[in-house]
């Protein structure tokens, strides 16, 4: 199978990239079902964009880098804030509908860490509406083909040039290559590394791992965001829109505890601060049933029914009417700020390999602001598509083949004759990550985590594979181990606390650590960021 452009992923970034290169032959290869898997369709809160004349790009830029602990890539942040409004209007052109004010302007709500109400929304199902519009528009173009239920297990890279990827067909178990002149990774994050996550089952870090295995540079992998509010036990997201509309957090003593952690911003502090606050309340015995209360019962019923409709239905399914009683919430693994290192054209250090969305690092720094992720998918999805389209104008397949790569994979599969249950190993890995590499970290725990991850890795070859599901779990476990090591080693390397990365043995934020940890192969290094690079964009 050959194509001009191969897009791996099925969320908002992948869809927007496909639209941008719609006049080329495009294959969107999706691990799940297009539009029904991935994180975009599940995103509830909103899309940040500057529309109000009293707001500004500088304010959005500053909020983003301040929230990100001043280790964001300032060039990428500038691109994000300046292009977000245009891409939101493109979404409306594609068919998505955003809520409007009575005067006809795009409605905007407050979100955490922002100095202005700039989060555009469609009730509390914004991501679903965005995907609906993107899919509707994509359906008009015959040159965009969609291949569902296929998992990328290896990139085809020769002499640092990417020529596509090798896939596992999740319906048949077949292994097959797709050759492409340009490849775009839009595979999202790795929330499934943790037992409590807002992410869907597809998010096992595949893009991080298959790119790293071929020599891609990754950045900020220690920065994993835990959304402050997930449903207790399941981790299912309770959108930030709940707090944006006036939701109040309090503990079992009915104390509004955020006053102890951020007296000024309270419930609308940045996600890292709120998540640690909730975690601390629970750990110190002030929680309730493993969480804390989040209450909107003081809001008018019509506000809840219109602006928090999804949340109302979500909790009614478990017997809780949020119009009358509080929710119980706790932190849930949510977003990877780190990922593939890209430039302003969404190029990686591998020629012909582009990346966009959550699989990339640099945009959000040490902590992502709510509402910036959906904007990220559209802004950088468009850029990745444009860059890939320009690349294929001057590059061909170069008579490449993947017979040897496919043969090695088949040999690897045939050698799996052990007796260990692969899913049990996945569960073991998740427990290790939650216990030692989650909201609060320390050196002893991180070192213990590495030992346990190494032990799990040694056992991978001893698993039994009985059918396609086991085979999928096997490749996912391999990827998850790679990503777990990247996160843990980076967290051990950064001897400070910044954003989502909190070291209780190094609780202070240190100026000498204002910069980025980069990993390529067995090498890891630190690149300092001078504060002046941010000042240049704020003048």
Curated annotation (Swiss-Prot):
Gene Ontology MF annotations: oxidoreductase activity
Species per Swiss-Prot/TrEMBL record: Methanocaldococcus jannaschii (strain ATCC 43067 / DSM 2661 / JAL-1 / JCM 10045 / NBRC 100440) (Methanococcus jannaschii)
NCBIfam families membership: PRK06263.1
Catalytic residue positions: 227, 243
Listed cofactors: FAD
N-terminal signal peptide: none
Swiss-Prot/TrEMBL keywords: FAD, Flavoprotein, Oxidoreductase
Highest taxon, organism lineage: Archaea
Stored InterPro entries: FAD-dep_OxRdtase_2_FAD-bd, FAD/NAD-bd_sf, Fum_R/Succ_DH_flav-like_C_sf, Fum_Rdtase/Succ_DH_flav-like_C, SdhA/FrdA/AprA, Succ_DH/fumarate_Rdtase_cat_sf
Family: Belongs to the FAD-dependent oxidoreductase 2 family. FRD/SDH subfamily.
Keyword Oxidoreductase found: yes
Protein name: Uncharacterized FAD-dependent oxidoreductase MJ0033
Pfam families, per the entry: FAD_binding_2, Succ_DH_flav_C
Residues reported in the UniProt entry to bind FAD: 6-20
